[in-house]
Amino acid sequence: MTELGPVAWPPAPIRTERLVLREPEARDRAAFIELLASPEVHTYLGGPRPRDELEREMPGAPERWPGSFVVDLDGSMIGQILLRRATEHRRPAAAGKVDLGYLFLPRAWGFGYASEACVAALDWFAAVLPGEPVVLTTQTANVGSMRLAAKLGFTEAERFQAWDAEQWLGLRSPVTPSA
């Protein structure tokens, strides 16, 4: 995965009705550790990382790189949105396209935050790199992620076996940002 391309980074914080998408900050470290160590979050992502390992290895201020947004609710991190160019993706249909990823703390599930944050990130992306398609990969067993992909307008490009499970690759064609 590499950078998005000719995008000014960081953008101004992106505000939605309930959320703010912003760059990671030092105050987010504990939430990142919680997110990466959560068995619930990583059910379909190969399992969580050991908390003690994360405590040792994670820098005081989480890494900042183009396409990495913290999802903030009332001043606290509840998740992360990732937009990264898939230069080395295993599937030809995804290679070179921007890949959408998202992780949310379990306490934030079921409130529509993922949908709200992803729509905002995709609208921002469509405004700064118009005409670019976006891909998303998830396990077909991850019902919530499959539902979110459909809600966001991703359509099936292919299914394939990887990581001992059936994977779903979706494509979202370029759209005009919503007003």
Segment roles from a protein language model:
Residues M1-R107, V119-W124, V128, P133, ...:
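GNAT-family acyltransferases
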Residues S76-G79, A114, G144:
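Glycine-rich acetyl-CoA-binding "A-motif" of GNAT/NAT acetyltransferases
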Residues G96, Y113, A141:
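Conserved acidic
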Residues A149:
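Conserved active-site tyrosine of GNAT-family acetyltransferases
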Residues L136-M146:
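Conserved beta-strand-loop-alpha-helix junction that forms the acyl-donor binding cleft
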